[in-house]
Amino acid sequence: MEKGHMLNTPCFVINTEIVESLVEDAILSVRKFWPNGIIGYSFKTNNLPWIISYMKEKGLWAEVVSSDEFQLAKELGYSLNRIIFNGPAKGKMEFIEAVENGTIVNIDSKRELKWLLECDAEKLKKSKLGLRVNFCLEEYCPGESQCGNEDGRFGFSYETGDLAQAIDFCHNHNIHLSGLHLHCSSKTRSLNIYKAIAEVAVKIVREYNLQLQFVDVGGGYFGGVSDKPSFRNYFELIHNIFSTEKLLENTNIIVEPGMSVIGAGIDY
């Protein structure tokens, strides 16, 4: 810290002991309930190359939300099959490259569904595709959602039937659906948010009789904050709800922490 105060430029000051403790806690908490659970570090939280390389060394995947972040992950040594590609800002070229090379790609729009038809047919059969689910979080957690009663900005709405149409599109074009992505932004980061996410995942799996490889519950957790839910609290709750559905007994989980694994360990 003393050396940091001597610098004549803004900088990040990283307490590696705190960051390591938070990362290890996240890993152990996920693996307690899903031995092969996937943890993707959210690049948008802080994409400082040292931090990304550190997360890679710890075994965390890259969670990216733009073509620039996708390219950064590759430049920093991530193999394409250890990247999770989310969000509506995917470029077409990077999207197709990701789909054809084993990246977990969570489809966010009808435009991306159409892009799938331009992918190599044989490679598409081996792809790992999820659908971003948009549901009314406010109905489950009044006063806790960022959007209130308005529709979220991302993904396919369950309530309007857009999700059903996306599922039908995949079935009609013989595109295998590997997963669902249900990240929700909230005001509270409460356990109720993840209870809702898990319950909606179960509801969709039952309604459409889906056999999925993964459910991506996103990020937004507290981390290293006293008197707030721990990683174990979140993941145990989700696991208990998933355990009520036989169709999910062989389904893996993806979590995407960002601030929860670095926030307490970084100063400026």
Where are these regions (language model features)?
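A charged N-terminal "starter" segment
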Residues: 1-127, 164, 168, 172-176, ...
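Flexible, glycine/proline-enriched loop segments at strand-loop-helix junctions
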Residues: 10, 101-107, 147-158, 186-192
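Short beta-strand segments
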Residues: 42, 128-134, 181-183, 216-218
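Active-site-proximal loop/turn and secondary-structure-junction residues that shape catalytic pockets
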Residues: 45-47, 68-69, 89-91, 109-111, ...
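Short acidic, glycine/serine/threonine-rich loops at helix termini
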Residues: 52, 75, 95-97, 116-119, ...
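Phosphate/diphosphate-binding glycine-rich loops and adjacent basic-rich segments that engage nucleotide
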Residues: 131-158, 167
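Metal-dependent enolase-superfamily TIM-barrel catalytic cores that perform enediolate-based chemistry
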Residues: 151-171, 187, 193-201
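C-terminal active-site-proximal or functional interface alpha/beta core segments in diverse enzymes
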Residues: 186-268
